[in-house]
């Protein structure tokens, strides 16, 4: 069977709830792990899918201990071949790991799918070691493609992308900063990554920036934000 055949991926989604991007690792998040190749450290990925990101972490850092939490049983079964994986709904707050176990906890396009992402990132503090980090990729609802639709009165959910029909929460740069500050984190890095935009969209950004407000150009260009954060000293226990 041709793995590029759309029907193949439709079958996987309908039968197993798996998507084509489940086996693509997130290079931008992995690049936020600042460790020497021979260092030993522990990583937990929330929503690890089929384990592609954890596998690439293990390839880059052979001494890393990799763990995953995944709600989809079929995906977790595949990921278990490369990591210690538990079938778990993170919002139920019952991770079976000891406190202060992990140097990194990863949320790769996960927080937008949660009913209470603030509560979840607070809950995960107990599993971070001293100087441990949260690493996350979060889609940007302020991207110019969404703003362009709103100007036409459209906010139509899609099968994937910024308006993915499974998204429960939406984030802008300011909302990400606000949530992690409220949760007790210090943001070490928060950078946008983008996709090409048209000349017309660039013109729209110029028009939006001419309006009164605090928005900056990057807030309309970033398709998603990649974050690295650690617990603030005043909230560590």
Q: What do the PLM-derived regions correspond to, one by one?
A:
Residues 119-133:
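A short glycine-rich, Lys/Arg-flanked "PGG" loop and its adjoining helix->strand segment in the class I
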Residues 91-93, 111, 142:
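Adenine-nucleotide cofactor-binding loop residues
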Residues 135-157:
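Conserved class I S-adenosyl-L-methionine
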Residues 158-175:
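Acceptor-substrate binding/catalytic loop of class I
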Residues 104-110:
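A short beta-strand submotif of the Rossmann-like class I SAM-dependent methyltransferase core
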Residues 176-191:
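A SAM-dependent methyltransferase catalytic signature shared across enzymes that methylate proteins
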Residues 1-100, 104, 118-121, 152, ...:
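Conserved N-terminal segment of class I S-adenosyl-L-methionine
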